[in-house]
C-alpha cells in the first residue's frame, strides 16, 4: 500500500512539473503583439544624391562614323537626365513617449535630407532629428501627430536578461512593416567589433535589412534591446542578430533628447 501511495505521489509531482513547463511556454504571442504593434514604426530616409548617369562620351578616331553617332546620342540624352535624384533608405523605430519621441539607429537616418515616419496604421509624418550618436548607433526623432494619439513602449531591464529567455523582434525588414519574429536570447555582452561603447545582446529571432532601429521585446512586452546588426554571408538572416541592450540605450536616448548629443566623461 505504501508503495502505491509513493508511486502516486511521484506521478503527481512529475505531472505538476510537466504542467508548469507547459505554462512557461506560451501558446501564442498574438495578444502581446497586438498590444505592441502600434508603438513600432517604419522609417524612410530620403537623401538627395548626384546622378552618376552622365558618362563621358567615348573617344573615336576623327572621322569615324561612331564619333558623330555618339556625340548626337549623348547630346540628346543628357538634357533629359536630372543632375540629382532621391535615394530612399528604410529602417525601423519605436515610440518611447506619446509626445512623439522616437528611437532608431543612427545609421538608418545618416545623411538624410528628409525623414518620414510611418505608423502601424500607415499614417505618415515628417520627423525632426533631435540628436544622434554615431558611435553608439542611436538617434532620436520627433514627430507632431496632431490630434492622433500615440502608443509608447515600456523599457525593460536588460541586465536581468538570461541566455535562453524569449525575445520578440518587430520591424520593417525589406520594407515589410509590422513584421514579427520570435526567438531566444543566444548570448549576452557580445562584442562584434562595432566600437567600444556597446556590448550586444545576441538573438536568433529573424532580423533582416530594414529591422535596424526596431525594438527587441521580452515576453512581458518590454523593450530589452534595439535591433542593430546581423552577421550573414548571404545578407539575409541566419539566426545571428544583435541588439543594443536597453540599459545602455536609455541613458544615451535621454541625453540625445535633452541635449542633442551624448556627453561622455574623459580621464
Describe every region a protein language model picked out:
Residues 1-9:
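Bacterial N-terminal signal peptides that target proteins for export
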Residues 8-18:
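Bacterial N-terminal signal peptides
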Residues 22-267:
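Serine-dependent protease modules
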Amino acid at each position: 500500500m505504501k508503495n502505491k501511495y509513493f508511486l502516486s505521489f511521484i506521478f503527481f509531482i512529475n505531472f505538476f512539473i510537466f504542467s508548469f513547463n507547459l505554462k512557461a511556454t506560451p501558446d501564442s504571442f498574438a495578444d502581446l503583439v497586438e498590444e505592441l504593434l502600434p508603438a513600432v514604426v517604419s522609417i524612410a530616409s530620403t537623401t538627395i544624391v548626384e546622378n552618376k548617369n552622365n558618362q563621358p562620351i567615348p573617344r573615336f578616331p576623327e572621322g569615324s562614323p561612331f564619333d558623330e553617332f555618339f556625340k548626337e546620342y549623348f547630346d540628346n540624352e543628357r538634357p533629359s537626365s536630372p543632375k540629382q535624384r532621391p535615394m530612399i533608405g528604410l529602417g525601423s523605430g519605436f515610440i518611447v513617449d506619446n509626445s512623439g519621441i522616437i528611437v532608431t539607429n543612427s545609421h538608418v537616418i545618416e545623411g538624410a535630407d528628409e525623414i518620414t515616419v510611418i505608423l502601424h496604421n500607415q499614417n505618415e509624418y515628417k520627423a525632426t532629428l533631435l540628436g544622434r550618436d554615431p558611435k553608439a548607433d542611436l538617434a532620436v526623432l520627433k514627430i507632431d501627430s496632431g490630434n492622433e494619439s500615440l502608443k509608447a513602449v515600456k523599457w525593460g531591464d536588460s541586465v536581468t536578461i538570461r541566455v535562453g529567455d524569449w525575445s520578440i523582434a518587430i520591424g520593417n525588414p525589406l520594407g515589410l512593416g509590422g513584421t514579427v519574429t520570435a526567438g531566444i536570447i543566444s548570448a549576452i555582452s557580445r562584442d562584434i567589433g562595432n566600437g567600444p561603447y556597446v556590448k550586444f545582446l545576441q538573438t536568433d529571432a529573424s532580423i533582416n535589412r530594414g529591422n535596424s532601429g526596431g525594438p527587441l521585446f521580452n515576453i512581458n512586452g518590454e523593450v530589452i534591446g534595439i535591433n542593430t546588426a546581423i552577421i550573414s554571408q548571404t545578407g539575409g538572416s541566419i539566426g545571428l542578430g544583435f541588439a543594443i541592450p536597453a540599459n545602455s540605450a536609455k541613458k544615451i536616448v535621454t541625453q540625445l533628447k535633452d541635449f542633442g548629443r551624448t556627453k561622455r566623461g574623459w580621464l
